[in-house]
């Protein structure tokens, strides 16, 4: 029987070899090469982190957060590099969701 960590590392390498992973990486590299897209992306990630911190402390985002999220949505949709990145990321997320189901299946069985 192989070491479970070896299997996890093999899975990691397999993910990096997927065309969808490579497409997300290429899209992210394109964002990094464009000052406007990079700024929006960095600001968006900081905003997401801020929302996560609120959620972790049990606080609810107020109306200003909703307005800010809508603003980011418009900026992302209006920038072809960013919209391409998020589209490619969603395609990769399908694999990650499937893998998550497979990995957590034994744990789910324990709870039944």
UniProtKB/Swiss-Prot annotation:
Pfam families: Com_YlbF
Sequence similarity: Belongs to the UPF0342 family.
Name listed for the protein in its UniProt record: UPF0342 protein SP_1372
Alphabetized InterPro entries for the sequence: Com_YlbF, YheA/YmcA-like_dom_sf
Organism listed in the record: Streptococcus pneumoniae serotype 4 (strain ATCC BAA-334 / TIGR4)
Superkingdom: Bacteria
Database matches in NCBIfam families: PRK13676.1-1
UniProt signal peptide: none
């Amino acid at each position: 029987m192989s070491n479970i960590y070896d299997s996890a590392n093999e899975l990691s390498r397999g993910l990096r070899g997927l065309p969808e992973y490579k497409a997300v990486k290429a899209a992210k590299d394109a964002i990094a090469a464009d000052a406007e897209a990079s700024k929006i992306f960095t600001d968006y990630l900081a905003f997401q982190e801020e929302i996560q911190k609120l959620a972790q402390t049990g606080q609810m985002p107020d109306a200003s957060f909703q307005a800010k999220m809508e603003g980011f949505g418009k900026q992302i949709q209006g920038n072809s590099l960013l919209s391409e990145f998020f589209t490619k990321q969603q395609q990769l997320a399908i694999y990650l969701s499937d893998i998550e189901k497979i990995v957590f299946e034994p744990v789910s069985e324990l709870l039944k």
